[in-house]
Amino acid sequence: MYGSTKPLDAATGGLATRQAVSLSPGRRAWKRFRRNRLGFFSLVLFLTLVVLSLFAEVLSNDKPLVVNYQGQFYFPLAKDYSEKTFGGDFETPADYLDPFIKDKLRQGANWAIYPPNPYGPKTINYFAKDPNPSAPSPDNLFGTDDRGRDLLAQLIYGFRLSVLFGLALTVIGVVIGVITGAIQGYAGGKTDLVFQRFMEIWGSMPELYLLIIFSAVFAPSVALLLFLLSLFGWMGLSDYVRAEFLRNRQLDYVRAAKALGVSNLQIMRRHILPNSMTPVVTFLPFRMSAAILALTSLDFLGLGVPPGTPSLGELLNQGKANIDAWWISLSTFAVLVVTLLLLTFMGDALRDALDPRKVDHA
């Protein structure tokens, strides 16, 4: 009575297929990535946490964001002021958590706007009622560590350090890995053989022992740790890129480019590299997870960042040393697990989105 719907279905399917084909590979991958709700939600949440951590000084600091004292505005985050500026007796830097200073900033028309968490990562709460480490309280929502420092502030700054360190180590590893892998895969022959033997020797070096030696010789710093881990963090990706270049250099479009007189550098950069980036992009979230774990592990062992620097590994070490202070281990472990889970979910979704065997459906 109503007729067949097969021609309409066929036409609709053909239109959807043509639309999918008309999309660029990047847009098709992004479309598949967004379809993975867990991966997309993880990306949004992770980026939100990272952006918030970049403004850690605004969210968690022991200095007010802005002060209005006797009709004048002061910005303690941008400039240090002495206690005398706010009615004190000394030229020492003002302690804005001191009840005397806080009372001065409340008198009359004076006012001050503090960050949501009025503690910095190194701020010691000398006015706490309980001995350190103290349990969560209205003054310190996540409690304090064994030195009296606010735990929430350390988690915020430690998360930022871990993410930025992981990102920097990942970028350095990708740059070195792509360059070395591309040279090996495209050149082949003796060049590839020499690189492979060098990587075998380099990879057999005891990385942990070298870290211990350098930590004993040089003053610990984030830059030193980043340099040492970068010496070994590129080899895994280099093998993937090498395999892609070995495969792609035999394809017809590379032979056609050579026949047209295109230079080897241009062929590698403009033709082979874009078609070899799938394993590189898929590798990024997992590489970043490994970098964050490496930093946390080394800090836990005392081989990481300088003492006093807020870090997740140092907090885990404090939790081990203070078993009764459950809030230290629990909160730090939760931050670390959530971070690694978000990166893992993003990596799985990215791998599926870049899988050429996946077919788009309307």
Language-model segments: which ranges?
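Gly/Trp-centered helix-boundary motif
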Residues: 1-174, 178, 182-183, 308, ...
